[in-house]
């Protein structure tokens, strides 16, 4: 169900709980969730070619073992695999790749794969941010299908270019200028008119 349908079918309190309920978690509850998510990611990463290139055959089973076995890494450690977009070495199949500049790096850009699961989580988080950005207090927010938003974003393949795509899946908020027009304009052109 799209977010805009939830606006008509659920109370603001129910929507708040779904998207912003994490704000009321205790520290222990929050850490339990984070540890579970870290274990899930650790298992996926450890069994991938990319993970094994760092682990050198080791298989950590706990977060403590992972911390002991895995050295601190930087993007430089992953660059050969990611820049070549070696999908077979990744923990999951990417749906798309985003990029950013690489200040101080050997190459001019960094690229990062996004899987369907990552995009779904990102979309949920974007909607949470939209709710929080329009709220005055817990359970109250001001999001409507008729809202307009300034397109002051770098377009795809930069990660900010995902925002209009993710919004489109959830709510018919209009961007000004329209996404179709904005992606053809320079940053200056988008923000001067």
Regions found by a protein language model. Name each.
Residues 1-193:
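Nucleotide 5′-phosphate-binding alpha/beta core
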């Amino acid at each position: 169900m799209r977010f805009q349908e939830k606006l008509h079918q659920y109370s603001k309190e129910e929507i708040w709980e779904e998207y912003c309920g994490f704000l009321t978690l205790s520290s222990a509850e929050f850490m339990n969730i984070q540890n579970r998510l870290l274990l899930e990611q650790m298992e996926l990463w450890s069994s991938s070619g990319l993970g094994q290139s760092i682990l050198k055959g080791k298989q950590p089973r706990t977060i403590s073992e992972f911390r002991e076995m895995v050295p601190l890494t930087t993007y430089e450690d992953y660059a050969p695999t990611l820049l070549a977009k070696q999908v077979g070495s990744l923990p999951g199949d990417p749906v798309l790749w985003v990029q950013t500049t690489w200040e101080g790096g050997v190459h001019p850009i960094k690229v990062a794969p996004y899987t369907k699961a990552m995009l779904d989580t990102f979309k949920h988080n974007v909607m949470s941010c939209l709710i929080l950005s329009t709220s005055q207090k817990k359970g109250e927010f001001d999001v409507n299908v008729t809202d307009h938003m300034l397109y002051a974003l770098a377009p795809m393949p930069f990660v900010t270019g995902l925002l209009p795509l993710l919004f489109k899946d959830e709510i018919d908020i209009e961007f000004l200028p329209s996404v179709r027009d904005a992606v053809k304009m320079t940053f200056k052109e988008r923000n001067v008119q």
